[in-house]
Amino acid sequence: ETLDTLKVNSNNEWGKLRSIVVGTALNANFPQYDNLYTTSMSAGGWKKTPPPSGAVPEQIIEETEEDLNVLIHTLDKFAVSVYRPNTLNFNEIVSTPDWKTDSQYAYCPRDTHLVIGDMVIETPMTTRARQHEAILLDTIRRQAIRDGAKWISAPRPRLLDSENLVE
């Protein structure tokens, strides 16, 4: 798939928006518990309220997609090019040599990528369930590079249980 010309260039947060990647809730999943979540939760938050796991209810996905489509329609009125990430079955297990988990979603691409000038930096995630999310922008990545963008990946932590410094 080839997209329209995709020029990457962001030097501030208030210039005219010309293009954007809008996430998707399709196939969203509440991933299995990972003690690394404690790094982004208030102390004891998971102990007080056990996290859900498994597929996000279809009603939530449908309502979220409806809201995202309204956003996309609004952006289209302002001639903003909208790109969307690929999606996967996020219930399937992904792994590294150190761990296995299911995935989460393709809802928040801004969490996984930082744009500075004409460079996109893939940023590491703090949870295993989101560690491989950058591949969902692979079609966009290939097009941006063809159109002159620089694209690098920051080092990714191994996300070992022993690396969890928050108790």
Q: What spans do the regions from the language model cover?
A:
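The feature marks the mature, well-folded catalytic cores of soluble enzymes
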Residues: E1-E167
